[in-house]
Amino acid sequence: MSQKLDVLSKYPDAVELGELYRQAGFDLYLVGGLVRGELRNTPGEFTDFDMTTNATPAQSEQILSAWGEHIWDIGKEYGTISARKNGAVYEVTTYRAEVYVADSRKPTVEFGTDLKADLIRRDFTINAMAAALPSGEIVDLFHGTKDLAEGVLRTPRSPQESFSEDPLRMMRAARFAARFNLTVAPEVFEAMRQMAPRIEIISAERVRDELIKLICADYPRVGLNLLVETGLAGYVLPELPALRMEMDPSHRHKDVYEHSLKVMEQAIEKETDADGPCPAPDFVLRFASLLHDIGKPKTRRFEKDGSVSFLQHDVVGARMVKKRMRALRFDNDTIKAVARLVELHMRFYGYREAGWTDSAVRRYVRDAGEQLQRLHRLSRSDVTTRNKRMARSLAQAYDDLERRIDELAAQEELDAMRPELDGEQIMAVLGIDPGPLVGQAYKFLLNLRLDEGELGEEEATRRLLVWWQEHGES
């Protein structure tokens, strides 16, 4: 018995469009994330619909022009015609096959008339399913439904063929593993390991975009481990696997790499909702947490007493972060934010060990700037010791630092508050000379401002005269 999606009640406009294609003698299928989400029982709210058809781009353009409120053909070269209707976007693409030739970054595109040929070129079986329109019947030629249920990532054909055509699919494998907590099939893992160097033909911008999606997924550890274990990380983020070789006994982890993953996961737990200071998923916080110790391999030093030190690994790490993020074509604001967090992540330990003056606390706030809330979360997350007493001590010290930051901020806000009238205006209104009465009047107006908020100069003058009649002249 074939499986069907309930498209009529959920997506009536898509069904209507499918009927128009059917009447014109063409097939139309829903593909992509919507089909996958429906089959995982996590459909979400879709306003963008990916579709595929055996109609040519010109034929799709004719159908969509009569149906949609607005159409555009910016993707026509690749077989895609888009339309907008009732607030949703429909992208209809002619069956096609993309082929990357050796050392090429761009695909050659060939249109076809066979659905199987179109689906087999897709990256993974979980993305190679289609829902026929208007019926909603599922077409699953490569057992994507089974792979979804089993949590396995496979390719419709051999992974070597798939990754040869588009090496970015290796990054996408890690991203989907991180998004859905999937295990890659052994043959996919082996192909990624063998073909990892081919990622170098892909533009830095495309690699960066996949890395961001991976870091912001629900299970980033899964995807990052896959990048490291297959060797892909050595080409896109080589500082990460370097941490596996760096023993750090202070954290009781097998290496700094494991500690860094744990810090990232603890930082994720401290993200906020959309109205908070660090809305989830917070890429800057996550990436800084992951890379906060990347300066350790270059600063490791064995001391005479047998201990290991990493002096200035924060400063060195910040420089390394900037260099790597520039290579990946990140924007300057994001680079500065991540680098600043890496640079400052050790500053808190000075407070714990010696305590700070008010001016030192202010410098901490000033140096953190807009990253203060993220720095709070990174510093608290950078505690992975199994020593519960040590963990409590660190948490209490940071509680104290945050309390002092809040107290100083409140005092500075108070100090910055001024009444509506200054000393010169008070003397002019009351007709008095400089002296203690001016100070008393100023204090009265300041308390009035604190109690009642902004009054305006006219009302403040009236209230001052009332006060003067009751207190000043006597």
Please report, for each region that a protein language model flagged, where it lies by residue.
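Catalytic cores of the polymerase beta-like nucleotidyltransferase superfamily
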Residues: M1-S474
